[in-house]
Amino acid sequence: MKTKSIRIYEQGSYDVLKVEETNIPILKSNEVLIKHHYLGLNYIDINQRNGSYKIKELPTNVGMEASGIIEEVGKDVKRFKVGDKITHCMNLGSFTEYFVLNENRLVKLKNNIDLKLAAASTLQGLTAQYLTQKSWEVKNQDYVLIHAASGGVGQILTQWSKIIGATVIGTVGNDYKASIAKNNGCDFVINYSNENFDSKVKEYTNNYGADVIYDAVGKDTFEKGLNCLAKRGRIVSYGISSGKIDPIDINKLRPLSASIATGGLLEYTKNIDEYQKNADDLFDLVHESKIKIQIHKEYNFDEIQKAHIELEQRKSVGKIIINLR
């Protein structure tokens, strides 16, 4: 049996992405067959395609997030039945119409959760969750600085931090994105194309600084963040959209008793009980509209190159999804 897949034979520009028919693997006893309805595009897909993140074995199917319906289950599968709604992330090769996966690498959705919203929020929502609860536990009255605040993770990070009671400062690259970030809940918004974000953070916090800086930009912002970090604060790096971070002198942190942390969502999906609970908590907030998910645009399967270009050129505000229905 065949399925359409997004595939690369080498890492490089958007034109390395190919739409091809590939074989569906034979189902093992602990695996399920999923019919995907929606795919979620994330910046990790850009990094894996362009070589910023190395892929050990090529050629390979790509993609890291999708939602759909269970079509078939292996004889030893306990958690799912045919017809269940599911979502999953951090499984390389997810950009296929049909996908075979171990039952412990996906989570069940409640019936009140829309599959489109699930594909638009699983990876980014769970990322925002571990960032605000594990990498740094955001507290009431914290000053939180979020780079790329109008992007998918940035929007959810803002809303989650506001639910907790933090003051949120967001950075963006243009005035349109500034309006998006402001409408999404940022207390202050900085356009870093014409303002120095470090000095503006000091101004907005009465020279206190940010308790935590969430940085998915990397090279262009990371070291400058040290200038506006509060005492005992933390910079959390979880992406490198502008390039790899230059080496820094860790002694610069010592006068502030500050710290640096990194984060990766994969670690928080390895224990299925934790993975399922975290997803349930996220989607409860989404269902209750306490966290609102903005979908920027839908593409069809054959438009994957266009979707990559739009995300890589930072033209998107919110989530780009691929519609397979």
Predicted regions and their residues:
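Glycine-rich beta-strand-centered segment in the early N-terminal region that forms part
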Residues: N23-G40, S52-G93
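NAD(P)H dinucleotide-binding glycine-rich loop of Rossmann-like/cofactor-binding domains
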Residues: T87-A148
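Glycine-rich phosphate-binding loop and adjacent beta-alpha segment
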Residues: V172, D220-I291, N323-R325
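Adenosine-nucleotide cofactor-binding segment
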Residues: K162-T221, N271-Y275
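Hydrophobic/small residue at the entry helix of a nucleotide-binding pocket
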Residues: V153
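NAD(P)H cofactor-binding loop motif with strongest signal on the N-terminal glycine-rich segment
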Residues: A148-A149, V217
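C-terminal capping/lid region of NAD(P)-dependent oxidoreductase domains
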Residues: E288-Q294, Q305-R325
